[in-house]
């Protein structure tokens, strides 16, 4: 259905305009999908935070805890998670 992981993110962004709840589910699925590239997962988590900050916390945590994710991306996810904790 999608040619790339970025296409999935693009589709979720378009969905956010019409159905934020469905977009949040899509962003969460992308962010938690270990088959998706690290940067795309982080991007999905960041976009999820814009749509539903509470739902972004588990997504950021999943990225931060994933030992297969690069250190910089894991650190960014942890920083985003810390920022969400202040909401």
Go through each PLM region and give its residues.
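Buried hydrophobic core positions in alpha-solenoid tandem helical repeats
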Residues: 26-28, 59-61
């Amino acid at each position: 259905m999608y040619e790339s992981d970025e296409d999935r993110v693009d589709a979720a962004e378009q969905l956010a305009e019409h159905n934020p709840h469905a977009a949040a589910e899509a962003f969460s699925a992308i962010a938690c999908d270990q088959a998706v590239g690290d940067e795309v997962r982080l991007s999905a988590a960041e976009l999820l935070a814009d749509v539903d900050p509470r739902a972004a916390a588990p997504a950021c945590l999943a990225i931060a805890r994933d030992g297969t994710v690069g250190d910089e991306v894991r650190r960014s996810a942890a920083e985003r998670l810390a920022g969400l904790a202040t909401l």
